[in-house]
Amino acid sequence: ILATNTSSLSVTEIAARTRRSDRVIGLHFLQPVPQVPLVEVVRGLGTSDATFRQAMDFVRLLGKTGVEVFEYPGYVTTRVILPFLNEAMHVVMEGVATPEAVDTSMRLGYGLQVGPLALADRIGLDEVNRWMQYLFEELGDLKYRPCPLLRKMIRAGHIGVKCGRG
């Protein structure tokens, strides 16, 4: 079995370059891997049921929960979280609330462990921007067009925890 952790390369395209496309699958681990109990198990066009079952067994062996996802740009987690992060940035850019108020509102109001802006900071604003641009190009949906504030922060070198400036 060839498993890839990519969230932007096509499992089907990778499989097409092998002689056993039925044995290629995506295992999308979310960051930080030790703390996140979820893995998206991504079926390419030719992924066999046997390969899928073995991948799910492997994920369980790691003590994680696997969810079946069919290949599509962004899978489930990335597709759903990016508009959320983007909208939080728009709220700050429009002066509706401070970053701290946005994160506190979402954490306490919805029982989240981390607010959307702190999450973007952990992921890295450059990565969030790259993912948004990829989904915007692939899907053409305006909800994935990066907020101007995100691009401004990146240009200023404020890309997140990894560089000490978010």
What are these regions (language model features)?
Residues L2-E71, Y75-R79:
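Rossmann-fold dinucleotide-binding core
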Residues A50-Q54, R60-E71, M89-E94, P99-G166:
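NAD(P)-dependent Rossmann-like dehydrogenase/reductase catalytic/cofactor-binding core
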Residues L85:
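Segments forming oxygen-rich coordination pockets for charged ligands
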